[in-house]
């Protein structure tokens, strides 16, 4: 089993976010979403645009099957509002470029996070690093 580690400094989090933002808004938002919510990637990828309209968000965690409700982080909510402008409410938030309306895969999310972190000098990462 590979060991993954957290990103240990705020500066590195900002650097990785900026790196992703320059490349792709969806990928930058995926990173921010993981950092601010602490959710598992399988739960993050289930979000649709309509799930971002309210002050709160609720999910049934895939692994634990527990129903939970959370407040949006103000910074994340601001970025979400910019990102979802003119998007279809039924569209996946982290939509794949392949297919009509599919979320990106867990594998793709892993590749996005790992590549960005490695390019910014952070190693031993995975999607769980965001938690």
Language-model segments: residues:
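Active-site/catalytic core of tyrosine-dependent DNA strand-transfer enzymes
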Residues: 10-13, 73-122
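Short, histidine-centered active-site or binding-site loop motifs used for metal coordination
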Residues: 63, 96-98, 131
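Basic, Lys/Arg- and aromatic-enriched nucleic-acid-binding interface segment
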Residues: 2, 6-37, 41
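Short, basic (Lys/Arg/His-rich) helix/loop patches that form interaction surfaces
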Residues: 18-23, 27, 89, 111-131
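Helix-turn-helix-type domain boundary/helix-start signal
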Residues: 3-6, 70, 102
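Conserved tyrosine-mediated DNA breakage-rejoining catalytic core shared by Y-recombinases
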Residues: 37, 46-78
């Amino acid at each position: 089993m590979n060991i993954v580690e957290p990103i240990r400094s705020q500066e590195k989090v900002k650097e990785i976010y900026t790196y992703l933002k320059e490349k792709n808004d969806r990928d930058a938002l995926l990173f921010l979403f993981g950092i601010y919510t602490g959710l598992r990637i399988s739960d993050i990828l289930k979000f649709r645009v309509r799930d971002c309209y309210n002050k709160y968000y609720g999910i049934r965690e895939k692994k634990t099957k527990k129903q939970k409700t959370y407040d949006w982080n103000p910074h994340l909510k601001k970025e979400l509002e910019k990102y979802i402008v003119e998007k279809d409410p039924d569209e996946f938030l982290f939509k794949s470029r392949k297919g009509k309306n599919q979320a990106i895969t867990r594998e793709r999310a892993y590749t996005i996070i790992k590549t960005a972190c490695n390019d910014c000098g952070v190693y031993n990462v995975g999607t769980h690093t965001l938690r």
